[in-house]
Amino acid sequence: MLEVQNLSMRFGGLLAVDQVSLDVREHEIVAIIGPNGAGKTTVFNCMSGFYKPTGGKILFKGGEIQGKPDYKISRLGLVRTFQHVRLFSRMTVVENLLVAQHRHLNTNLLSGILNTPNYREKEQKSLDRAAYWLDRVGLTDMANREAGNLAYGQQRRLEIARCMVTEPKLLMLDEPAAGLNPAETKDLNQLIISLKEDYNVSVVLIEHDMSLVMDISDRINVINQGRPLASGTPDEIRRNDDVIKAYLGEA
Amino acid sequence: MQDLLYFIQQLINGLTIGSTYALIAIGYTMVYGIIGMINFAHGEIYMIGAYTALIAITGLAALGIAWLPLILIVALVCAMIVSSSMGWAVERVAYRPVRGKHRLIPLISAIGMSIFLQNYVHLAQGSRNIGFPALIEGGFRFGAEDSFQTSITYMQITIFATTLVCMTILSLFISRSRIGRACRAVSQDLGMANLLGIDTNRIISATFVIGAALAAVAGLLLGMYYGSIDPLFGFIAGLKAFTAAVLGGIGSIPGAMLGGLILGVAESMTSGYLSGEYKDVVSFGLLILILLFKPTGLLGKPEVEKI
């Protein structure tokens, strides 16, 4: 579904990402791990169109997407979250989910002013979808609160719900468990698995929480100092000497 | 008793002017809220609204139409259409190409646009004052015959009522409609809104169009209220409305409404109790004070980054 081939990203004299390749198949959770500063988020930024890579190719559903503007990539069904929460914090929880469906509504101004049946039907549909996802991430009671007033873990879940109402094919999560307590991480764990199982979404995630990564990933890519170090199933990665060295330092 | 009547008179005058400031200020505050720039050509959009209304009124008079509601509605619709198109075109031509560049660049582009539009109207319509027919005359008077009488004219009532209707529609539009929702999202995080598939260019255009339409309403109302217009008509009104927007908290729509009313009342109180010469001193003095002591304005919220 997604294929990254020999991706390189150079900032002036710094080669932040060097010849990284990875692929994501349908119905799969792939993790990108590596020490701090390894270039994981840079890879993400290239994939989501935030940066224009200086080398390599990124194919999504067969089409090249490297260098395309981020909003075009997201319209193809490749949506991401950021390391820090980026909700519309002064809008209510349900409004956050409605506004994300703006494009899908595809109605014009006039039908809104006249409140035509067609407009109302579409509004109702997006409201239903919002309600469904609120229930799914356990935020129904918070629907009319301002998003900025939610607890951090709830904001994280709302972000995922907001991605999901756009009906993505591939979800990219940048450190989804950062700042969550163990109970919240466990909830998140189940949520991500269910995205794959029940909604047929592939997930790429960057994560430092190893228990989460090992639990849910189908495959793991390890990056160190911008270069690919290893890739394989969680078991293979756990036994890989290079990975152990990179994480623990050479003795 | 007489003092009270005098005070009430100043209050009525102030609220009248203030509500038109508020109408113009909406345009400044919405544009600032969404793309963080001051649209200095907004005063000119308002002036063009007034001219268009006058042309429409003159045209209808030439056709021999004398039914007042029809004249007002046609003038209003014409002014709104022309101003909105201008607002849209100004953004498209002068601001969109320089969006995302250094902050000063759109600002200078806006000042250039303002000078251009002003001079265009100078050339097209002449630089002298043109009389604006009052159309709505008469009013109520309160107080004894032989002493000071408070008066409230039908024109003033029209201004209040129109402003109230416009503000109500705007508030409902922003809080309820799909595009209003998208406007709020874009103003909070343009990049994210873009990522979520909102056509941010269209939303930005919509903001300019809405602001310009409200300015056109103010143009018609103030043209009738003052009785004459000239190509510089938009300049001071624009500055005042900008002050109102900053006073209320730029970026905040209720702030612009409140700021307009406060500024209008402050001005009329100064003219009534001190001297008309001082009213601009007071309004721009207020601007300086607010910038010194509460730069985010009365209703503006300071941005707090949560980490």
Name each model feature, range by range.
Chain B
Residues 20-28, 41-61, 86, 90, ...:
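Hydrophobic alpha-helical segments within and immediately flanking transmembrane helices
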Residues 19, 28-51, 100-105, 179-182, ...:
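Short, non-helical or kinked segments that cap or interrupt transmembrane helices
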Residues 2-20, 127, 152, 173-178, ...:
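Inter-helical junctions in multi-pass inner-membrane proteins, predominant
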Residues 97-98, 106-176, 203-206, 269, ...:
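Transmembrane helix-bundle core of multi-pass membrane transporters
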Residues 34-37, 41-89, 93, 149:
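Membrane-embedded helix boundary and interhelical linker motif in transport proteins
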Residues 1-25, 52, 63-75, 101-105, ...:
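Membrane-interfacial amphipathic/re-entrant helices at transmembrane-helix boundaries
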Residues 148-229, 253-258:
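Helix-loop-helix "hairpin" substructures at the membrane interface of multi-pass membrane proteins
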Residues 33-41, 85-131, 173-180, 235-250, ...:
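Short loop segments and helix-boundary regions at transmembrane helix junctions
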